[in-house]
């Protein structure tokens, strides 16, 4: 764990693990909604194939449900966009550290994903701070644990939220 000067650029933030993980979550949510919408669109047509009026009513019900589900998806997307905007707006206020990712745990919220706990020195006090659960071997995962386990990374510590954001691996 080495504290260093925060020379991170906005381009590095936009290419960071943290930023791209959130972008990937948004894409997964959109694809999931499109998949549900596409498959469920077939139901009104399959059920009411003999009546035009029933097809119209089925389509109206389908459309209402997709708006309802889309509202929840939209709230989640806004959450991720807000987190990325927060990072872009405040990254210069965070302390930069070079750490080794060697202590991991399984996330409860993101099943099958892992997060790392890093030990940093902040204002003279040692702290154990968690990253977000970026890493997984699942199909839709952008970052796999093998690429980062026991590797040195540069990250930013947000003392307000007590979070450690992984920016990039050190070569």
Q: Residue spans of the language-model regions?
A:
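Alpha-helical transmembrane spans
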Residues: 2, 11-90
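Short, charged juxtamembrane terminal tails flanking transmembrane helices
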Residues: 2-5, 170-171
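Exposed regions on extracellular, virion, or secretory-pathway luminal proteins
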Residues: 51, 84, 88-96, 123-128, ...
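Structural detector for short beta-strands of small beta-barrel domains
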Residues: 89-112
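Beta-strand secondary-structure signal
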Residues: 98, 115-119, 154
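A structural detector for beta-sheet-dominated domains
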Residues: 102, 119-121, 167
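OB-fold (S1/OB) nucleic-acid-binding surfaces
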Residues: 109-134
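A membrane-cytosol interface segment of integral membrane proteins
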Residues: 130-171
